């Protein structure tokens, strides 16, 4: 009993640290949308909410995002690209379009603007080193950051383009003065548009992060086989152990089997975090956000060990009491909050809490 209290005290401490750090460092990932022109721009409801809008560009493409801002409100923009695309020379343009803005930089001929609008073309060069992000975990090049107050109330547009020319901007607010330049851009590449500054999540956005993680790894250029290799190997090792002990396992109740499988999925998530952390660190420099990844790893592994340990206890453990239901319900909730188990792990933990613990017959 004391050991179980220590386990859950440790997990509770991780939850506190995790949720104190998450709002300050994480962005809501968003995928999809067309936005081929200002008229069909991808509309953003709350431009102050911090999010990353992921997309892909072919050569010559421009993608438009529209949002409404009141005069004096902050407009915060940023642009990131995968490490592989950046190493190939893909550096898309980032342009802010709006009322009260003076044209700065060389505005592309293909850029569409409503009448009376101005455009700020952000100038930048590829950074020396990619950035490590601890929650996914991932690595990327951060190309540009832009933070101004809206000069007028109205609709503003952020345009990301894979165009063949980009020039520096003039004016006191220029981010970097690089001089007019012509550059060839690869045929296509991926990008992430950062918009907003308030780090908030809805419950749905938070719980659905595991699906977004897979999409982000794909955005980076990873294949599904590579993404799921750590999880598959962990499950394979666990199932092999079950097979070798099949004479014992055959007498397990459905609740115990569900608990063991939930534990394996939690452990597999921890192995995936380790795997992705090593991949990302091999591309980027060391960052303090590594400690966020360690929290994710320890949480997933801790949940996995706890689920398996509880499942292997004597079959009469928790029968007819609230203890078993409480423990596995807690594991299921923690799995959802820590993005452990790819949804299936928490589901199996809840199943273990509900199914009969004692094997019939």
What are these regions (language model features)?
Residues 21-23:
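N-terminal signal peptide c-region/cleavage motif recognized by signal peptidases
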């Amino acid at each position: 009993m004391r050991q179980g209290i220590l386990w859950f005290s440790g997990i509770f401490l991780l939850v506190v640290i995790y949720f104190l750090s998450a709002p300050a460092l994480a962005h809501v990932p968003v995928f999809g949308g067309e936005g081929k022109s200002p008229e069909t721009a991808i509309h953003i409801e709350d431009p102050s909410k911090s999010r990353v809008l992921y997309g892909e560009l072919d050569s010559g493409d421009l993608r438009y995002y529209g949002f409404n801002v009141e005069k004096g409100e902050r407009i915060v923009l940023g642009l990131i690209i995968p490490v592989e695309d950046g190493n190939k020379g893909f550096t898309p343009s980032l342009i802010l379009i709006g009322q009260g803005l003076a044209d700065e930089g060389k505005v592309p001929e293909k850029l569409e603007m409503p009448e009376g609008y101005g455009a700020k073309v952000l100038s930048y060069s590829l950074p020396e080193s990619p950035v490590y992000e601890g929650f996914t975990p991932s690595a990327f090049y951060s190309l540009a950051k832009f933070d101004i107050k809206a000069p007028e109330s109205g609709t503003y547009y952020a345009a990301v383009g894979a165009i063949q020319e980009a020039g520096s901007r003039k004016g006191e607010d220029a981010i970097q003065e690089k001089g007019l330049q012509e550059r060839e851009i690869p045929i296509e590449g991926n990008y992430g548009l950062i918009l907003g500054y308030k780090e908030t999540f809805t419950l749905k956005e938070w719980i659905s992060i595991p699906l977004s993680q897979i999409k982000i790894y794909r955005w980076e250029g990873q294949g599904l086989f590579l993404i799921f290799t750590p999880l598959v190997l962990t499950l394979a090792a666990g199932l092999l152990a079950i097979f070798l002990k099949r004479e014992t396992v055959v007498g397990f109740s459905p609740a115990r089997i569900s608990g063991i499988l939930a534990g394996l999925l939690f452990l597999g998530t921890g192995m995936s975090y380790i795997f992705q952390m090593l991949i990302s660190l091999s591309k980027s420099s060391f960052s303090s956000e590594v400690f966020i990844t360690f929290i994710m790893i320890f949480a997933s592994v801790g949940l996995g060990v706890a689920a398996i340990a509880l499942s292997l206890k004597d079959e009469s453990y928790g029968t007819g009491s609230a203890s078993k239901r409480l423990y596995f319900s807690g594991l299921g909730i923690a799995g959802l909050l820590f993005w452990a188990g790819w949804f299936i792990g928490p589901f199996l933990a809840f199943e273990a809490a509900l199914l009969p613990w004692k094997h019939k017959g």
